[in-house]
């Protein structure tokens, strides 16, 4: 964290350093989420993945091993999660920076991506992606499709490695092998969430969305809950995000007050000063 980063806490657009710092603090210091429950991707992840897709045409002319745009994109970020099995996590948080705007993707039950479409029951853990956007200007379908494509490739790579390891150990039993198939992409652009009132608070709202989501995850105790097919279809934001249901009007009370953004900026600046020796 530099002085330039710190100065952005006043009223400027939060950059990648500040987003990563804020999200890391939430998961590692404030709420102490275990790795088996949550993985937070770097703020560079999505941008780097898209760079790989964009470079496909120029790369395929001199590298005939590149089979597809998606394979090249995956190769750009493959090593970023080499030390963690993201499919053991219940949730993945992915901050997205696109067109000078931040939004947040929350992937639920990534391990259920291999459940063939049409086979999930209402109360089963369900693979889905939520999109929280404080301006509503990001294309939810495009963003979630890119992450869906990444996860499918990551699953195939992971399974291939596990099969190879079993073969090395002399285990040739394929009885536990599931029929190849993937769940459909199911996404939801969450409505009714607090929105920014200016052009610079999008990063602050990403941290606020993440904080309130993590806070609710831990509210139920040590056993962090999950999202079922029924919860997704019925948009049970009270059970997923902890939003309070408003019986009159059939909607939800505000998740938090939008004015929190000003306090959040001040708190972030103070935190950077307090942690200067540790994070500089």
Regions from the PLM with identified roles:
Residues 144, 152-280:
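C-terminal folded domains that constitute the principal catalytic or ligand-binding module
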Residues 1-103, 107-129, 137-140, 166-167, ...:
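Cysteine protease catalytic domains with a Cys-His-Asp triad
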Residues 21-24, 28, 42, 94-98, ...:
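Ordered, helix-dominated protein-protein interaction surfaces in large eukaryotic regulatory proteins
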């Amino acid at each position: 964290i530099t002085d330039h980063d710190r100065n952005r806490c006043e009223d400027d657009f939060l950059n990648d350093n500040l987003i990563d710092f804020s999200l890391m603090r939430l998961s590692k210091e404030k709420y102490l989420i275990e790795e088996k429950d949550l993985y937070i991707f770097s703020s560079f992840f999505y941008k780097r993945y898209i760079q790989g897709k964009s470079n496909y045409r120029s790369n395929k002319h001199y590298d005939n091993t590149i089979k597809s745009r998606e394979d090249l994109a995956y190769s750009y970020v493959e090593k970023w999660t080499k030390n963690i099995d993201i499919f053991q996590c219940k949730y993945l948080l992915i901050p997205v920076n696109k067109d000078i705007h931040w939004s947040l993707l929350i992937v639920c039950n990534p391990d259920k991506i291999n459940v063939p479409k049409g086979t999930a029951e209402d109360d089963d853990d369900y693979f889905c992606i939520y999109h929280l956007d404080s301006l509503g200007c990001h294309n939810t379908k495009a963003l979630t499709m890119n992450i869906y494509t990444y996860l499918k490739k990551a699953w195939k790579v992971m399974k291939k490695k596990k099969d190879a390891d079993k073969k090395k150990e002399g285990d040739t039993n394929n009885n536990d092998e599931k029929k190849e198939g993937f769940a459909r992409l199911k996404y939801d652009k969450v409505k009714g969430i607090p929105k920014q009132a200016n052009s610079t608070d999008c990063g602050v709202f990403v941290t606020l969305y993440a904080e309130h989501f993590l806070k609710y995850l831990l509210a139920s105790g040590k056993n962090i809950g999950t999202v079922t097919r029924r919860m997704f279809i019925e948009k049970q934001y009270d059970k997923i995000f902890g939003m309070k249901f408003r019986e009159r009007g059939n909607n939800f009370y505000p998740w938090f007050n939008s004015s929190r953004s000003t306090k959040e900026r001040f708190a972030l600046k103070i935190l950077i000063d307090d942690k200067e020796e540790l994070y500089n």
